[in-house]
Amino acid sequence: KKNANEKMYPASMTKVMTLLVAAEKLNNESLDQKIEISIEATDYSFKNECSAAGFLVGEQVTVEDLLNGIILPSGAEAAYQAAIMTSGTLEQFVDDMNKKVQELGISQTTHFSNPVGIFDENNYSTACDMAVILHAAMENEICKKVLSARNYTTSCTQQHPQGITFSSKFLNRIDRKFGKGKVVGAKTGYVNQSRYCAVSMYESEANNKYICVTGMAGKAWQTVYDHIAFYQNYCK
Protein backbone atom coordinates (compact mmCIF):
# COMPACT_ATOMS: atom_id res chain seq x y z
CA LYS A 1 0.00 0.00 0.00
CA LYS A 2 1.20 3.50 -0.84
CA ASN A 3 -0.73 6.53 0.41
CA ALA A 4 -3.67 4.16 0.84
CA ASN A 5 -5.30 6.19 3.59
CA GLU A 6 -4.51 9.67 2.34
CA LYS A 7 -7.38 11.95 1.39
CA MET A 8 -8.08 12.02 -2.33
CA TYR A 9 -10.73 13.41 -4.64
CA PRO A 10 -12.28 10.40 -6.41
CA ALA A 11 -13.52 12.17 -9.54
CA SER A 12 -15.73 9.84 -11.60
CA MET A 13 -14.81 6.87 -9.42
CA THR A 14 -17.61 8.43 -7.34
CA LYS A 15 -20.00 6.89 -9.85
CA VAL A 16 -19.30 3.41 -8.45
CA MET A 17 -21.13 4.55 -5.31
CA THR A 18 -23.80 6.22 -7.44
CA LEU A 19 -24.37 2.96 -9.27
CA LEU A 20 -24.45 0.96 -6.04
CA VAL A 21 -26.94 3.24 -4.26
CA ALA A 22 -29.22 3.29 -7.30
CA ALA A 23 -28.96 -0.46 -7.91
CA GLU A 24 -29.88 -1.30 -4.33
CA LYS A 25 -33.22 0.42 -4.89
CA LEU A 26 -33.89 -1.66 -8.03
CA ASN A 27 -34.41 -5.26 -9.05
CA ASN A 28 -33.94 -7.19 -12.28
CA GLU A 29 -37.58 -6.63 -13.27
CA SER A 30 -37.14 -2.84 -13.12
CA LEU A 31 -34.24 -2.81 -15.59
CA ASP A 32 -36.61 -2.71 -18.57
CA GLN A 33 -38.61 0.20 -17.16
CA LYS A 34 -38.51 3.32 -19.35
CA ILE A 35 -37.19 6.60 -17.96
CA GLU A 36 -37.41 9.97 -19.73
CA ILE A 37 -34.28 12.09 -19.81
CA SER A 38 -35.03 15.53 -18.35
CA ILE A 39 -33.63 18.89 -19.35
CA GLU A 40 -32.38 19.23 -15.77
CA ALA A 41 -30.18 16.16 -16.28
CA THR A 42 -28.61 17.39 -19.50
CA ASP A 43 -28.26 20.94 -18.14
CA TYR A 44 -26.48 19.60 -15.05
CA SER A 45 -23.98 17.80 -17.24
CA PHE A 46 -23.47 20.78 -19.56
CA LYS A 47 -23.18 23.47 -16.88
CA ASN A 48 -20.63 21.45 -14.93
CA GLU A 49 -18.66 20.58 -18.09
CA CYS A 50 -18.99 16.86 -17.41
CA SER A 51 -18.61 13.87 -19.68
CA ALA A 52 -21.96 12.67 -21.03
CA ALA A 53 -23.48 9.42 -22.24
CA GLY A 54 -25.20 11.23 -25.11
CA PHE A 55 -28.81 10.86 -24.02
CA LEU A 56 -31.09 13.67 -25.25
CA VAL A 57 -33.89 15.59 -23.55
CA GLY A 58 -37.16 13.67 -23.84
CA GLU A 59 -35.46 10.42 -24.82
CA GLN A 60 -37.08 7.33 -23.34
CA VAL A 61 -34.33 4.98 -22.19
CA THR A 62 -34.44 1.85 -20.08
CA VAL A 63 -33.14 1.75 -16.53
CA GLU A 64 -30.47 -0.67 -17.73
CA ASP A 65 -29.41 1.85 -20.40
CA LEU A 66 -29.22 4.53 -17.71
CA LEU A 67 -27.05 2.44 -15.39
CA ASN A 68 -24.63 1.53 -18.16
CA GLY A 69 -24.57 5.20 -19.18
CA ILE A 70 -23.30 6.08 -15.70
CA ILE A 71 -20.26 3.83 -15.93
CA LEU A 72 -19.03 3.09 -19.45
CA PRO A 73 -19.13 6.64 -20.90
CA SER A 74 -19.15 8.16 -17.39
CA GLY A 75 -22.32 10.06 -18.23
CA ALA A 76 -23.20 12.85 -15.81
CA GLU A 77 -26.72 13.16 -17.19
CA ALA A 78 -27.22 9.43 -16.61
CA ALA A 79 -25.98 9.73 -13.02
CA TYR A 80 -28.24 12.73 -12.39
CA GLN A 81 -31.29 10.99 -13.87
CA ALA A 82 -30.63 7.82 -11.89
CA ALA A 83 -30.39 9.88 -8.71
CA ILE A 84 -33.76 11.53 -9.35
CA MET A 85 -35.31 8.23 -10.39
CA THR A 86 -34.33 6.40 -7.21
CA SER A 87 -34.34 9.13 -4.53
CA GLY A 88 -36.60 11.88 -5.85
CA THR A 89 -34.12 14.72 -5.48
CA LEU A 90 -30.39 15.15 -5.91
CA GLU A 91 -30.04 16.18 -2.28
CA GLN A 92 -31.80 13.05 -1.03
CA PHE A 93 -29.66 10.85 -3.27
CA VAL A 94 -26.47 12.39 -1.89
CA ASP A 95 -27.84 11.74 1.61
CA ASP A 96 -28.41 8.13 0.57
CA MET A 97 -24.84 7.91 -0.71
CA ASN A 98 -23.52 9.05 2.65
CA LYS A 99 -25.81 6.65 4.50
CA LYS A 100 -24.20 3.89 2.46
CA VAL A 101 -20.79 5.28 3.40
CA GLN A 102 -21.76 4.92 7.06
CA GLU A 103 -23.07 1.41 6.46
CA LEU A 104 -19.73 0.43 4.93
CA GLY A 105 -17.88 1.82 7.94
CA ILE A 106 -15.85 4.42 6.07
CA SER A 107 -17.56 7.66 7.12
CA GLN A 108 -14.47 8.97 8.93
CA THR A 109 -12.56 9.24 5.66
CA THR A 110 -15.16 9.36 2.86
CA HIS A 111 -17.95 11.81 2.09
CA PHE A 112 -19.86 12.58 -1.08
CA SER A 113 -21.43 15.87 -2.14
CA ASN A 114 -22.62 14.90 -5.62
CA PRO A 115 -23.27 11.70 -7.61
CA VAL A 116 -20.92 12.53 -10.48
CA GLY A 117 -17.52 13.23 -8.95
CA ILE A 118 -17.41 16.94 -9.74
CA PHE A 119 -14.55 18.41 -7.71
CA ASP A 120 -15.67 19.65 -4.32
CA GLU A 121 -13.74 19.81 -1.04
CA ASN A 122 -16.59 17.77 0.48
CA ASN A 123 -16.45 15.02 -2.16
CA TYR A 124 -13.50 13.00 -0.94
CA SER A 125 -12.33 9.49 -0.15
CA THR A 126 -9.18 7.37 0.15
CA ALA A 127 -7.76 4.57 -1.97
CA CYS A 128 -8.67 2.05 0.73
CA ASP A 129 -12.23 3.33 0.93
CA MET A 130 -12.66 3.24 -2.83
CA ALA A 131 -11.61 -0.41 -2.69
CA VAL A 132 -14.31 -1.02 -0.06
CA ILE A 133 -16.90 0.66 -2.29
CA LEU A 134 -15.93 -1.31 -5.39
CA HIS A 135 -15.97 -4.55 -3.41
CA ALA A 136 -19.50 -3.78 -2.19
CA ALA A 137 -20.62 -2.92 -5.71
CA MET A 138 -19.21 -6.14 -7.14
CA GLU A 139 -21.30 -8.07 -4.60
CA ASN A 140 -24.44 -6.62 -6.20
CA GLU A 141 -25.39 -8.51 -9.36
CA ILE A 142 -26.77 -5.46 -11.18
CA CYS A 143 -23.63 -3.45 -10.44
CA LYS A 144 -21.32 -6.33 -11.31
CA LYS A 145 -22.86 -6.70 -14.75
CA VAL A 146 -22.44 -3.00 -15.48
CA LEU A 147 -18.92 -2.66 -14.06
CA SER A 148 -17.66 -5.70 -15.97
CA ALA A 149 -19.13 -4.71 -19.35
CA ARG A 150 -16.62 -4.05 -22.11
CA ASN A 151 -19.25 -2.74 -24.53
CA TYR A 152 -22.97 -1.99 -24.33
CA THR A 153 -25.52 -0.77 -26.86
CA THR A 154 -28.60 1.02 -25.59
CA SER A 155 -32.11 0.21 -26.73
CA CYS A 156 -33.38 1.89 -29.89
CA THR A 157 -35.18 5.19 -29.40
CA GLN A 158 -36.69 7.86 -31.63
CA GLN A 159 -33.63 10.01 -31.01
CA HIS A 160 -31.16 7.15 -31.50
CA PRO A 161 -32.74 4.54 -33.84
CA GLN A 162 -29.60 2.39 -33.70
CA GLY A 163 -29.07 2.96 -29.99
CA ILE A 164 -25.82 4.33 -28.56
CA THR A 165 -22.82 2.04 -28.21
CA PHE A 166 -20.71 2.59 -25.09
CA SER A 167 -17.25 1.10 -24.61
CA SER A 168 -15.02 0.81 -21.56
CA LYS A 169 -11.67 2.06 -22.85
CA PHE A 170 -9.95 0.95 -19.65
CA LEU A 171 -11.22 -2.63 -19.75
CA ASN A 172 -10.72 -3.03 -23.48
CA ARG A 173 -7.18 -1.66 -23.25
CA ILE A 174 -6.25 -3.84 -20.30
CA ASP A 175 -7.66 -6.92 -22.05
CA ARG A 176 -5.33 -6.28 -24.99
CA LYS A 177 -2.28 -5.74 -22.79
CA PHE A 178 -2.73 -8.30 -20.04
CA GLY A 179 -3.56 -11.94 -20.70
CA LYS A 180 -3.32 -13.57 -17.27
CA GLY A 181 -6.51 -13.75 -15.24
CA LYS A 182 -9.13 -11.09 -15.88
CA VAL A 183 -10.04 -7.63 -14.70
CA VAL A 184 -13.70 -8.14 -13.80
CA GLY A 185 -14.76 -4.58 -13.06
CA ALA A 186 -13.43 -1.03 -13.23
CA LYS A 187 -14.14 2.70 -13.20
CA THR A 188 -11.84 5.52 -14.17
CA GLY A 189 -11.92 9.21 -13.34
CA TYR A 190 -10.22 12.54 -13.81
CA VAL A 191 -10.06 15.81 -11.92
CA ASN A 192 -7.09 18.16 -11.83
CA GLN A 193 -6.53 17.42 -8.14
CA SER A 194 -6.20 13.64 -8.66
CA ARG A 195 -5.20 13.54 -12.32
CA TYR A 196 -6.16 10.26 -14.02
CA CYS A 197 -7.34 7.72 -11.48
CA ALA A 198 -8.93 4.29 -11.57
CA VAL A 199 -10.29 1.51 -9.39
CA SER A 200 -10.46 -2.06 -10.66
CA MET A 201 -10.97 -5.62 -9.49
CA TYR A 202 -8.85 -8.47 -10.82
CA GLU A 203 -9.50 -12.20 -10.63
CA SER A 204 -6.36 -14.30 -10.99
CA GLU A 205 -6.07 -17.66 -12.71
CA ALA A 206 -6.14 -19.14 -9.18
CA ASN A 207 -9.51 -17.39 -8.64
CA ASN A 208 -8.11 -14.96 -6.07
CA LYS A 209 -9.58 -11.45 -6.18
CA TYR A 210 -7.65 -8.21 -5.78
CA ILE A 211 -8.59 -4.53 -5.97
CA CYS A 212 -6.25 -1.81 -7.21
CA VAL A 213 -6.81 1.94 -6.79
CA THR A 214 -4.46 4.43 -8.42
CA GLY A 215 -4.28 8.16 -9.00
CA MET A 216 -2.05 10.98 -10.22
CA ALA A 217 -1.33 9.39 -13.61
CA GLY A 218 -0.30 11.92 -16.24
CA LYS A 219 -2.15 10.18 -19.07
CA ALA A 220 -5.25 7.99 -19.29
CA TRP A 221 -3.27 5.08 -20.74
CA GLN A 222 -0.89 5.23 -17.78
CA THR A 223 -3.66 4.06 -15.46
CA VAL A 224 -3.87 0.86 -17.51
CA TYR A 225 -0.16 0.19 -17.08
CA ASP A 226 -0.31 1.08 -13.38
CA HIS A 227 -2.97 -1.57 -12.83
CA ILE A 228 -1.24 -4.16 -14.99
CA ALA A 229 2.00 -3.63 -13.05
CA PHE A 230 0.18 -4.07 -9.73
CA TYR A 231 -1.56 -7.26 -10.79
CA GLN A 232 1.59 -8.73 -12.35
CA ASN A 233 3.81 -7.97 -9.38
CA TYR A 234 1.58 -8.64 -6.40
CA CYS A 235 -1.20 -11.04 -7.35
CA LYS A 236 -1.19 -14.81 -7.49
How would you name each of these model-derived features?
Residues 1-128, 137-138:
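Active-site-adjacent loops and short helices of periplasmic peptidoglycan-processing enzymes
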Residues 84, 88-236:
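Penicillin-recognizing serine hydrolase domain
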